[in-house]
Each structure stands twice: as structure tokens, then as C-alpha cells.
Amino acid sequence: MSVPTHARDRWEELVAQINEARSRYYERDRPTLSDEEYDALYRELVELENSHPELASGESPTQTVGGERSEMFDPVEHLERMYSLDNVFDDGELEAWFERVVKGIGSLPPMLCELKIDGLAVDAVYTKGILTSLATRGDGRVGEDVTANAAHIPAIPQKLSGGTVPDLIEVRGEIFFTLADFTTINAEQLEAGLPSFANPRNAAAGTLRQRVDKKLIELRESERSGARRAETLRGEVDRALRRLSLLRLTVHGIGATRGLSITQQSDGYTELASLGLPVSDRMDVRD
């Protein structure tokens, strides 16, 4: 059955709007839509594709995760794909999800419930206990290499400790600012005549997705040559390093592993905590 012209036209409008919103949110860290506005567009797109499955092509935002990788950073292919979370918007949708679970496995299993941190999703790889890679989620398969910045973020362990350290473990988590630090950062932005961040998530993304390593090299060269720009650069570098030091990390997932076997999410959290990785204390297992 062919798709009506009005449906295809609306699909194209929604795809364009959502892709632009994603670009501003994930790549430029300057969102123009509220979460509610974005969710409404996305829900309309899902409903349209459910009515006309022919529209659900690979170019649809419903078939992809996150945003494109910035050319500022080298690409990093995740060892295992990173997925995003699905949303429900009312009790009815949650009940429908429960019903699908029961239908799929025969009963409702114990569930781990956890508050979601709205931060920047990252993927960290530890090889023989040493942090060897830190990357953004990107499109779920390939992210941005921000490993150089990890050395300036005390919340990210550079080395695993305690427990039995696996040969390799890929962990996923959220980088974020506390509300208090976000308020301070926005006040600094305004005082410096810079635009404020729309929300803590975008402040965290803007802070992590900087080439501080290049700025440090440029600063050293400017100081050696006595360039006037050295003072300005020193202020930029100091601000970037200070903000990196304020970033927090909560680890909530495990990707590829070698020398580690986990069968339950709660056991995974226990293992991650034993290795010195920060996990949420806002969680509970419910039967």
C-alpha cells in the first residue's frame, strides 16, 4: 500500500525537525526545543511510522541513536553498541510494557529501579585495570575520543582498585554537573559575557567536548613567544580545567568484558562499586 502524500510530507517535516533538534542538542550543545516539545515530535513520528511502516527507513531518527560525531575529535568504535533508553509517558504505557515482558518470558521478574541522571552518556574502557579510552556515545556505534580530558576529571578513576580486576571491562555512564555547580558555571558565563547553558546536561557536554589538550599546547607556545594572546588563553584554559574538575560520573552499564561474568544488573553494580567505580545510591531491586 502506498503512503499518502500528506503522511509522507509530514514524515519529512518531522524528520527534519528532529534531526535539527538532535544536532543542536548532541553536537552543538545549544538546544532550541524543550524535552516536552522534542518528545511530542518524536511520538508523532513513531505513531506515523506505526501507521505506515514503509516510512521507517534507515534515515529516520527512530532508527538511530544520539547525534553525529564532531570532526574535532578522533572516532572511537565502541566494543559493544551503546543503546538509548525508551520513554513512557503515562501509566498506561508502563502497564503495556509490563504486559509485553510477561508475554515474552512468562512472568514479571525482579526489577532494578534507578533514578536516571540526565547527563552526557560516555563509554570508558579499562584494560588490565587502567583507563585506556573515554568516548562519548555518538551514534551508538562510534563516539568521540575525549580520553585526554579524563586526566582532568577526578570523578573518573584512572585505575581500578579493589575486587578482582578483569582483563578488560567497558563501562557506560553519565557525565554531569550538580545543580549547585551548574548555577555557578552559568553565573561565570554571564559575568564573562558568554551565553549561558540551557541546562546542566548541555553544560556538561560543552565542558567535556573541548580540546583542552590543544589549548594547553597553544598556551605553552604563546607563553614561550610572549604573544599577547597568552593571557586570554590562560584564562580559557584555567576555566576549562576548573570545570572539568567539577564533572561527576555515575556508572550504570557494562559493555564488553574479558575475565568477568555478570548475570544480573544488581550484581553488576556491586562489582563496579568493588572496583572503585561510582554507581548510583538511588536504586532498589523490586520483586
Positions of PLM-derived features:
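RNA/tRNA-interacting regions in translation and RNA-turnover enzymes
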Residues: 1-287
